[in-house]
């Protein structure tokens, strides 16, 4: 017998034969005992040699390795069918050089397919790992541009940020107004031409709310006027409001009993209030007319707050109106700066129950009684 010469090709062929025997046992094919005996004889040097496929398929639970291994086993089973068809190869434990070259080419194709799969997976991971948010993309691009400007000029050119921001459309990013205390949502929706959202918001508002919205700003009024349904509701609500105001006014005035003015009762119940009267400055020319009109207004205002048992007198100091009490014969000036309290009998300061020092009572010319036989009495008799 000739001893086989074990080389690298023979080790590869033996490895492929081993896989064939395993598949034969699993699938139920018969394998000759001579082939198994030839496969069991191996040199120590051949056992240490390993192919690239063996070094790559260390992980049995790896899905990728499992698919490649299955593919190689299928190829080996096809070779087994070919070898079993020839009687020479079934009896002898050797393979031809042509078959070994075909198997090596198959291994090279498997290695290339594995490399392509790994490279495609790495590209997919890189594509998915990149950020899809425009804000993050803007930040990365701005950092790159700032880094380039710093390398050129040794200083950061912050104008680059505005130029980069124009290309990313950050004005359309949702949440750009977060953190602000006041945000005009209706104006923002109008600028973005979202009329369907505005129509839905206005449809949820009541009639009174629409009237209030028109009074907020011109922009809100314009938004309501652009929506036909909201505009009709607003006009109808305004008309209803005006009509209801008129009807309520007519009901309260026309169909109720005559009401008495309670100003007199209010003045009786309230304590006397001394109102400040501003004295107008005196000017040359129309000073007398101004004084007369202002004095008249003072007396009119003082008369409105009088009680039933009071009357008006002229103050002996400033000629302003004074409240007169007929029971006590006392008068108090209504002018705050004066506020003179005097006795109406002696025109001096009020002295309570003490008798007046000056008992001579001064009467005006209109209040003097006619004396019999006087010239005035004679004139009055002639007139009769």
UniProtKB/Swiss-Prot annotation:
Consequence of changing residue 162 to N: In hrpx1; recesive allele that is lethal and induces a reduction of neurons number but with an increase of size. Induces rereplication and mitosis cessation
Biased composition range(s): Polar residues: 45-54
Segments forming domain F-box: 187-234
One GO term of the biological process aspect: mitotic cell cycle
UniProt keywords, alphabetically: Cell cycle, Cell division, Cytoplasm, Metal-binding, Mitosis, Nucleus, Ubl conjugation pathway, Zinc, Zinc-finger
GO cellular component, one term: nucleus
Residues annotated as binding Zn(2+) 1: 315, 318, 333, 338
Protein's UniProt keywords contain Cell inner membrane: no
Example GO molecular function: zinc ion binding
Pfam entry (one): F-box-like
Superkingdom of the organism of origin: Eukaryota
Main location: nucleus
Region (Disordered): 25-67
Biased composition (Basic and acidic residues): 55-67
Compartments where found: Nucleus; Cytoplasm
SUPFAM superfamilies membership: F-box domain (SSF81383), RING/U-box (SSF57850)
Zinc finger ZBR-type: from-to: 311-359
Its job: During embryonic development, regulates the integrity of the genome and therefore the cell cycle progression by preventing rereplication through an APC-Cdh1-dependent mechanism.
Name of this protein: F-box only protein 5
Organism in which the protein naturally occurs: Danio rerio
